[in-house]
């Protein structure tokens, strides 16, 4: 359910990738706005470039693409909205849909800086992100 689109030859260790339920209450308490709209995806990727794009596959999304926001946990344990220029929601073939359908597989591509705001890992050349969609 996760891969590195810029480095398809590099496999993500699925033992270091998790999908968990994030309750609406916890989402709001931690700083999310609106409704939680998917799984909390926590992913660790080793031996990365200074800036790495991570792609997360997901289904069950419906509504207008522009209504969705991506939130990421920071080291302070709070959710922060990820800037639109750092992520996109697309189909598997790279198209940006206007409307989402629950039975279609989508990909969230998020760019993370090693050691940046949304990198939860203190290890150099390793990123750990925890992201969730809201709408």
What are these regions (language model features)?
Residues 2, 43, 54-56, 108-110, ...:
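Generic structural hydrophobic/aromatic packing signal, biased to beta-strands
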Residues 80-101:
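Extracellular/luminal ectodomains and secreted, surface-exposed scaffolds of diverse proteins
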Residues 95-135:
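C-terminal beta-strand-rich structural cap/linker in extracellular carbohydrate-active enzymes
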Residues 24-75:
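Proteolytic processing hotspots in large secreted/extracellular or virion-associated proteins
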Residues 1-20:
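Predominantly extracellular/luminal regions of secreted and cell-surface proteins
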Residues 43, 68-70, 85-87, 92, ...:
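Generic beta-strand hydrophobic packing signal
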Residues 9, 19, 48-50, 63, ...:
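Generic "edge-of-domain/loop-turn" microfeature
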């Amino acid at each position: 359910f996760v891969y590195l689109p810029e480095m398809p030859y590099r496999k993500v260790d699925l033992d270091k990738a998790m999908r968990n339920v994030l309750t609406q209450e916890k989402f709001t308490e931690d700083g999310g706005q609106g409704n939680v709209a998917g799984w909390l995806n926590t992913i660790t990727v080793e031996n990365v470039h200074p800036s790495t794009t991570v792609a997360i596959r997901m289904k069950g999304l419906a509504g207008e693409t522009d209504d969705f926001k991506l939130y990421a946990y920071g080291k302070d344990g709070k959710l922060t909205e990820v800037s639109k220029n750092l992520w996109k929601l697309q189909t598997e073939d790279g198209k940006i849909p206007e409307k989402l359908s629950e039975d279609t597989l989508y990909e969230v591509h998020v760019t993370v800086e090693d050691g940046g705001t949304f990198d939860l890992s203190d290890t150099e050349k390793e990123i750990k992100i925890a992201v969730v969609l809201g709408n």
